[in-house]
Amino acid sequence: MGDAQAARDARELGKKASSSFAQRYWDAERNVPIEGHRRNGQAMQDRGLGAVSAIDQRLFNDQQAGRVLDQIASWRFQTDWGTRSIAMSEPGYDPTAYAHGSVWALGTAEVAQAYWTAHRPVTAWQIWRTLIPWSSLDSPGHMHEVLAGDIFNPQVESVPEQTWSSAAFLSSAVRGLFGIDVDAESNTLSLTPHLPSDWDHTTVSNVRVGASKLDLQFDQTVSGLTLYIKDSGPPVTLEFQPEIPLGARSVAAALNGNASPVNVTQDRQDWHAHVKVTITQAESEIALHWRDGVQLVLPAPTPELGGPSTSAKLTSFSFENDALHIGLDVVRSTNTELEIRTQLRNPNSGSLQLTRLAPDRYEVIIPPVETSVNSTYQHEEATIRFVKSRRSK
C-alpha cells in the first residue's frame, strides 16, 4: 500500500498488455477474434463467446468490438432459447456437446448484458428474454444448466436446477434491463433502464440505497415516461438515465411538476435522457416527454419442445434522416412480423407489407418466399421512411 513506483509499474504493464491483446487475439485474415492458442502456439479456429469479456474490458478497438457484436447477434450464434457457445458454422460445433455449441443460460445472460453495455438494447432484450421459456422445462420455475444447440431440449448432461442460471438471469435484468447501480457511500442511485417499448407499466420494489428503501414505478407511452418514487428514508441522489426512442425530439423533464434540466446522449442504436435530482419527499415523480422518435417491437420467441429455432434475429437497428434501418436474419419460408411505435406519419416501407394498427402503431411483415424449400436463415435489410409529425416542424 502506498508504493507509488509499484503503482506506476502496474499501470505501464497494464497498458502494454492491453495494447498487445488485440494483436494476439485477432485473426486479421478472417476478421474474427481468436478464442485462444494451443500449446504449440497455433490459434484455435472455432468462434465462441470468449470475445464478449474482452469487449467488456475494452481490449478490442471499436471496429473490432462492433464486428464481434454483429457476428454474435446473428442466427449462427442465436437460437430461440439462447446463445450458442460456439457458432454453428464452426468445425468444432456440436449441438449436443456440453461446451461445444450447446446453449448456456449463464453465457446467454452475459451476452445480453454485453449488448446493453455496448448500447444495443433491442438486441440485448431479444437475447435476454430467450431465457424465459427455460422456466417451463421440467419443474416450473426452475432453470436448467444447459440446453442443446439445435433443438429446444435440455442437453443430456444438464443439471435440471442450476443456481447460476437463475442468478445470471436475474442479475442481468437488474444491471442491464433496469440499469440499477447503487453507491451507498454517497447515497446515490443510478437508474439506466432499457424498458421494452411494449411495456406500459413496470414496478421495482425494495431498492436499498444506504438507509433508504425505494419503490419504483414506470409508466410508459409512445411520447413519454414517468417514474414514480416512494422513499422511506433520508434524501437520495438520483441519476435517472432512461432509454428513449431513437430520433426523439423536444425532450423535456419535470420533477414533481417543476421543469428540470435534461440532456440527451445519442448512440447509433441507443438514445438516453439524463436527469439528476435529489429525492427529498416520501413520494416524487419524474416525468419525461418527447416528440417523434421510433421504437421497435419484436415478437417473443415461442420455441416448441424438440423444435428448431425459427424466429427472426435482430442484427442492427438505427434511425437516421427520418429513416429506420433494420438488419434481420430470418427464415424466408415463414412470415416475419415486427411492430413499430412512433408519432411519425406516412411510413413508406417499400416492398414490405405495412398495416396501421393504431395512430402510433404499425405492423410490418416481411413476406415469405414461396419458392423456398428449406428452413435456413437469410440476412435481410429493411428501410422504412417517415414524415415528421406536424408538431415537430
Where are these regions (language model features)?
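Extended glycan-interaction surfaces of carbohydrate-active proteins
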Residues: S18-W104, S136-I151, Q217
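Non-catalytic C-terminal accessory modules of carbohydrate-active enzymes
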Residues: W75, E110-T355
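Alpha-helix capping and helix-loop boundary segments enriched in small/acidic/polar residues
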Residues: Q5-E12, G41-Q45, P95-S102, E157-W164
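Surface-exposed interaction regions enriched in Ser/Thr/Asp/Glu
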Residues: Q281-A300, E370-K393
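Aromatic sugar-binding surface patches on proteins
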Residues: D267-A273, D360-P367, T376-A382
